[in-house]
Amino acid sequence: MARKMKTMDGNTAAAHVSYAFTEAAAIYPITPSSPMAESTDQWATQGKKNIFGHPVKLVEMQSEGGAAGTVHGSLAAGALTTTYTASQGLLLMIPNMYKIAGEQMPCVFDVSARALASHALNIFGDHSDVYACRQTGFAMLCSSSVQEVMDLGAVAHLATIKGRVPVLHFFDGFRTSHEIQKIEMWDYDDLADMVDYEAIDKFRAECLNPEHPVLRGSAQNPDIFFQAREAANSTYNAFPAIVEDYMNQVNAKIGTDYKLFNYYGAEDAESVIIAMGSVCETIDETIDYLMKQGKKVGVVKVRLYRPFVAEKLVEAIPDTAKVINVLDRSKEPGAREPLYLDVVNALRGTKFESCTINGGRYGLGSKDTTPADIIATFENVDKNEFTLSIVDDVTNLSLERGETPVTAPDSIVACKFWGLGADGTVGANKNSIKIIGDHTDKYAQAYFDYDSKKSGGVTMSHLRFGDDPIKSTYLINKADFVACHCAPYLTKYNMVQDLKDGGTFLLNCSWAPEEVGEHLPGQVKAYLAKHNIKFYIIDGIKIGKEIGLGGRINTVLQSAFFKLSGIIPEEDAIKYMKDAATASYSKKGEAIVKMNHDAIDAGAKAIVEVPVPAEWADAETESLFVEAKGDNKPLVDYINNVQNYVNGQEGNALKVSDLMPYVDGHMPLGASAFEKRGVAVDVPSWNPDNCIQCNFCAYVCPHATIRPVAMTEEEAAAAPAATKTADMTGMPGYKFAMTVTVLDCLGCGSCVNICPGKKGEKALTMAGLDSQRDQQEVYDYGQKLPAKEEVLAKFKADSVKGSQFRQPLLEFSGACAGCGETPYAKLITQLFGERMYIANATGCSSIWGGSAPATPYTTNAK
């Protein structure tokens, strides 16, 4: 049966299937599951019908616990009900999950599996949350890819209806939930054909109804509780066969080969991995690579994790297996991990009892697992407990890995884009991969990697496309095309080093071709020359400003990418990009749509090729790190040993011993002051002649990057040459300066907007960062000056002006440019900071306030 192909992410695939079978959905958003609920809400609002002929009834509750309670109640009333969640949200649902399972209600929870907060919060993927649900009585079905989410999502719903066991259908958070792939979609008519409608009628007939009243949820005593609990055994014993039957029905319809445990690899494999989740895709790809070299390797993919059917696992493993390595994406401190223990127990007393069975941990908190890690696993014989992708030099559990080979098929083209959070790079690449997927016969994949800055942080978009299916569920480190959308990144990150020989590098910058070489670090020039890289530049910022888009340069650079890649004929690419821009921005008005259309036209024409001189090959390497110095040794050590590496996107190189001082998750205060990201395009420039010294600008600044300074005559005379001052109002003998740390500013313009100025002329205007770099020295000088007690006495802390002469103990956070939350938090620290305890619930403020490696909270000289 041929199915329609469409480009979508895992969350959309899960929502598409669940919507078909769902009559009611109770939700509460949590990353990375929120898009599933959002899609369901959107479709219901649009009147989209499920297989029963009506839209889904959706309700958002006050928490995940409330959502689970609503699911339970809705099921009790006879409605097929679902929810979407992850991580701590899933944990809040566990009490109701016991009830739903115990009362044998048909239900599916779609879970984008995510790490649980332990020593630190982590919003990324692993299996900690779903493992915590093993005892609830929910069946657990795992999908390894976006396509499997679509296919096995149907199996989950069909099986729970017939088998009366609720199903937790899970897939890896971010790696699968947010990965975009070109996949085959279910048609709702085909899903409806497989539904057991008699089972639905039976479920509804047994639900709470005044026509046939019954009591559920009684309290049982020791005399009967145990027996009643054991009475469920037959239901669970029968359920795997029901799942298997629906897998077979799906296989017959769409030509797949889904089983409870699927084997892939050599028929005579001697080294076998057992795993579940997205890592199975990487294992498949690595197996293809190794088998070409004659290696006898294979993988058993766990589909139905609960109930765990031991005999089916035994059937899946090749008889020739000698070494079995089991991979768990979780850590169980003080014990071995769940899947490993399940496998050891299942193989006891079987023909595989004499095999070496090792267990390893991988991928915690979305740690990237590469083909090199898989090769190391296949080669592992004697390390019974091990870890992947890290260097554990403390307990020595890690497997050593070599260089990652190119294991993807030759047809696959890999592209990597470095963007600035909120510049539109991610959105543009989502459109690009959908254009490639939906308008060519090529396979397509996109994945997006972020830091934890709310906006203004670094984003990395990983795009792959080609003639073969794409199973590369790991980050690109061998690229055919790399684009840098933010020129300052060149002095912060190693990016051109990801290019293959003969690859293409596109740089968005304001430099003329003849002056580019003056700005490139030595290692960049050397790599371009030594590896025959084709080098292009484009001034996207200039084009964006001329058109009226400001810093939103996404469509400009998207157009440049299609021009250089040649994946689609230029005229077709421009048409598809304009269609996508119209769909994305039509609600914002025709003017915005036209601006984006103009940007697309301009981007394709504005690319300039830069010749790479041969002498660049001899350029000297320059350090990307600025060594911290100071008297605060714990802070300085942290900056030099941890923060610099993480901020340089080199955190994966840190060893376990490097993190030992911070094993409890604490961070030293004041670390954000060392970041000096310098990512703003424009920063405020102060004109003292127009200033009334109200300090409104400092008051509203979200990042504490503009601050008033009172100087004595002597201090002013000794100030850097670029210092601008005015006589201080109400304080004879003092000079006033409004200083800006331009390397910490995000360029939001809040200070300019609030500035009253004089006679219609503002004291602050926005100017290019490069023109204001000398103001950093002025700011640094001002911060070293002692506080002026006379000024603090004159201007009280309970006034706007007076408060801003007090040191903020919240500075340079990862909040969005123009954030409306941080100015209040900053002000509180200025008023009460010396005696504050801060308890922060999860949300925006926990990310801008406590996201590794830097915290914006700081201390004063005391």
Question: Where in the sequence are the language-model features?
Answer:
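Structural signature of the thiamine diphosphate
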Residues: 140-202, 366-403, 595-618
